[in-house]
From Swiss-Prot:
GO terms for cellular component: axon; dendrite; HCN channel complex; plasma membrane. This is Potassium/sodium hyperpolarization-activated cyclic nucleotide-gated channel 3. Hyperpolarization-activated ion channel that are permeable to sodium and potassium ions, with an about 3:1 preference for potassium ions. Contributes to the native pacemaker currents in heart (If) and in neurons (Ih). In particular, plays a pivotal role in maintaining excitability and promoting rhythmic burst firing within hypothalamic nuclei. Exerts a significant influence on the configuration of the cardiac action potential waveform. Does not appear to play a prominent role in the processing of acute, neuropathic, or inflammatory pain. It comes from Homo sapiens. The lineage of its organism: Eukaryota, Metazoa, Chordata, Craniata, Vertebrata. Residues 119-124, 193-201, 275-297, 320-329 are extracellular.
Length: 774
């Protein structure tokens, strides 16, 4: 090599001045490169074999070591530990353990049968199986001295040869050595087995029982880390979750262990009489099965063992000899233990598959006991049951604890996903900064309200605002028309902005799923995002103006300049959407009621309170008798008023709507659809009723009537709506008397008070109302 390289170098030095000497430079690299081929041939194979002994980068190694860098460090540790050191998480060790596991299970099944039912084991298949098993067990014994050991206590891996040897000699070496003695090799070499007498033969057969100690080696292979590795690989194949895979593996391991114990017990039932040369009182001699085939002997022995283990009998007959008695007791003890273990594991497995539903059932049992202890009425219990069903839907989680254990980015991702429906339907979040949306969502609390619940009570101190995920709610303000809120709306922010009291009541009309934001979290978020405070204040002021109220704090803040043009555009979008939503829900309100016919009806809860409704009907008749108006069959008669106002009464939120026939005078008139007046009754739970008779549209005369049908003056304060006697515009009404938050109607005071100044709204019909207390 040096002789060839030196002339090439000299030629290149001499050819430097001229260009003709450049081509001869090319051959030396080829000659130099072709020289080391014989030495570099085994290097790729050795390198490939070395990678098989090292941990590879996969999901399992990343889970164990944490990162790619940690895996590379572990690979360097294997290289520096010495030659032929096998890492316990390497691919070679994984496949070797899998082969040994299968071979070991085969030995645990085949060896008891061969020892028990076969006297001559010189057949070629039996010899091949024994020799192959002994060879693999001896190789496994040698490889264990070069395989790293996982120290469970310190979560480290021993790779030093001296440390591996010392620890293996102190733990599993003796068991592996005894179970790996090549008895078949000894018999084949010296050919001792044919010349053995009976005692030597029995001794040799007893030595074969030592193979059962390989059960302890099975425990060594079934370490937790390897089980997790198998589970993860099966997850990728069958696309199963970790809980389902672990549950299936646990139940299969338990069933396999019980079947293996039954197999061993059956072989033991026949082995003991065989070692005693089948005494006359043993079950084999009694059943005359000494010379039967091994298949029939094994079947009867297995049936006898399973009968004992399952505690269903003694098999074909009760034990007679003392060895059979002791074997029966042993089988019963083992069977009872396995049965208890199986029941315990199966129960724990079933409970772990649906722990959230089990937790909900346990919680609801406590609720039932609580209701029984306090003797709550049946309707309250039903409401509590329905609340739990809608709130938890059969599953209960400790959501705060689960989210609190996660990292902040993962927690925000989960909250954004679970609240995606709320964000999609709410323009406030659609036009806001994503950081603001995330800040709000992480502080929300989920709540459920039932139909009829007052979410917000007028005049109370506000400590929360609410975002509607699903449901329909009504805003009840004194002297103002109802406003409906549905998915994507929010309410309760006015008192948080002004630090005052609630300006209106909010009632749930359906089951509502809301998210609440406390005042502390509300102020903390708005301090971080001042532009969103401006948006909340703009919408709040517009809502107050729509119900005829004002707030000096909001007006003063409204007069301040806006932070930017984008904020003003967003405020306009929010205000317009809020108005459109209120207008749209009111337009859809009549469709939520019952379908009306052309006949005049009264809407009243007759099904739930027939006696109260009958009393109300009597009061209606009295009111109609004292009404100063045209004849019953004229266009302005009470029958005409009832028929024309049927569709308006369907949208009234005063009470549940049930149709009732108005009277015999209603069947003789066919009336047009446009309403002129509305007559309906509203009942509270306390037994009080209210009858309202609304007058014609603005421009027509109308007079208010008292409880006895007498005309009232405009200054009488017993009516919630104000109207002048000459038909001038007054305060708008919704077509029905608003129930106070308590659900009761107060009696009208007898002392006159000055009337409130009217707020002209000609678009809203005025009405004359009559209140009758039952």
């Amino acid at each position: 090599m040096e002789a060839e390289q030196r002339p090439a170098a000299g030629a290149s030095e001499g050819a430097t001045p001229g260009l003709e000497a450049v081509p001869p430079v090319a051959p030396p690299p080829a000659t130099a490169a072709s020289g080391p081929i014989p030495k570099s041939g085994p290097e790729p194979k050795r390198r490939h074999l070395g990678t098989l002994l090292q941990p590879t980068v996969n999901k399992f190694s990343l889970r164990v070591f944490g990162s790619h860098k940690a895996v590379e460090i572990e690979q360097e540790r294997v290289k520096s530990a010495g030659a032929w050191i096998i890492h316990p998480y390497s691919d070679f060790r994984f496949y070797w353990d899998l082969i040994m596991l299968l071979l070991m299970v085969g030995n645990l099944i085949v060896l008891p049968v061969g020892i028990t039912f076969f006297k001559e084991e010189n057949s070629p298949p039996w010899i091949v199986f024994n020799v192959l098993s002994d060879t693999f067990f001896l190789l496994d014994l040698v490889l264990n001295f070069r395989t790293g050991i996982v120290v469970e206590e310190g979560a480290e891996i021993l790779l030093a040869p001296r440390a591996i040897r010392t620890r293996y000699l102190r733990t599993w070496f003796l068991v592996d050595l005894i179970s790996s003695i090549p008895v078949d090799y000894i018999f084949l070499v010296v050919e001792l087995e044919p010349r053995l007498d009976a005692e030597v033969y029995k001794t040799a057969r007893a030595l074969r029982i030592v193979r059962f100690t390989k059960i302890l080696s099975l425990l060594r292979l079934l370490r937790l880390s390897r089980l997790i590795r198998y589970i993860h690989q099966w997850e990728e194949i069958f696309h199963m979750t970790y809980d389902l895979a672990s549950a299936v593996v646990r139940i299969f391991n338990l069933i396999g262990m019980m079947l293996l114990l039954c197999h061993w017990d059956g072989c033991l039932q026949f082995l003991v009489p065989m070692l005693q040369d089948f005494p006359p009182d043993c079950w084999v001699s009694i059943n005359h099965m000494v010379n039967h085939s091994w298949g029939r002997q094994y079947s009867h022995a297995l049936f006898k063992a399973m009968s004992h283990m399952l505690c269903i009998g003694y098999g074909q007959q009760a034990p007679v000899g003392m060895p059979d008695v002791w074997l029966t007791m042993l089988s019963m003890i083992v069977g009872a233990t396995c049965y208890a273990m199986f029941i315990g594991h199966a129960t724990a497995l079933i409970q772990s598959l649906d722990s959230s539903r089990r937790q909900y059932q346990e919680k609801y049992k406590q609720v039932e006991q609580y209701m029984s202890f306090h003797k709550l009425p049946a309707d309250t219990r039903q409401r509590i049951h329905e609340y739990y069903e809608h709130r938890y839907q059969g599953k209960m989680f400790d959501e705060e604890s689960i989210l609190g254990e996660l990292s902040e980015p993962l927690r925000e991702e989960i909250i954004n996903f679970t609240c995606r429906g709320l964000v999609a339907h709410m323009p406030l979040f659609a036009h806001a900064d994503p950081s603001f949306v995330t800040a709000v969502l992480t502080k929300l609390r989920f709540e459920v309200f039932q139909p009829g619940d007052l979410v917000v009570r007028e005049g109370s101190v506000g400590r929360k605002m609410y975002f509607i995920q699903h449901g329909l709610l009504s805003v009840l303000a004194r002297g103002a028309r109802d406003t409906r809120l549905t998915d994507g709306s929010y309410f309760g922010e006015i008192c948080l902005l002004t630090r005052g009291r609630r300006t209106a009541s909010v009632r749930a009309d359906t089951y509502c799923r809301l998210y609440s934001l406390s005042v502390d979290h509300f102020n903390a978020v708005l301090e971080e995002f001042p532009m969103m405070r401006r948006a909340f204040e703009t919408v709040a002021m517009d809502r107050l103006l729509r119900i005829g109220k004002k707030n000096s704090i909001l007006q003063r803040k409204r007069s301040e300049p806006s932070p930017g043009s984008s904020g003003g555009i967003m405020e306009q979008h929010l205000v317009q959407h809020d108005r459109d939503m209120a207008r749209g829900v009111r337009g859809r309100a009549p469709s939520t009621g019952a379908q009306l016919s052309g006949k005049p009806v009264l809407w009243e809860p007759l099904v739930h309170a027939p006696l109260q409704a009958a009393a109300v009907t009597s009061n209606v008749a009295i009111a109609l008798t004292h009404q100063r108006g045209p004849l019953p069959l004229s266009p302005d008669s009470p029958a005409t008023l009832l028929a024309r106002s049927a569709w308006r009464s369907a949208g009234s939120p005063a009470s549940p709507l049930v149709p009732v026939r108005a009277g015999p005078w209603a069947s003789t008139s066919r009336l047009p659809a446009p309403p002129a007046r509305t007559l309906h009754a509203s009942l509270s739970r306390a037994g009080r009723s209210q009858v309202s008779l609304l007058g014609p549209p603005p421009g027509g005369g109308g007079r208010r009537l008292g409880p006895r049908g007498r005309p009232l003056s405009a200054s009488q304060p017993s009516l919630p709506q104000r109207a002048t006697g000459d038909g001038s515009p007054g305060r708008k009404g919704s077509g029905s008397e608003r129930l106070p938050p308590s659900g009761l109607l107060a009696k009208p005071p007898r002392t006159a008070q000055p009337p409130r100044p009217p707020v002209p709204e000609p678009a809203t019909p005025r009405g004359l109302q009559l209140s009758a207390n039952m």
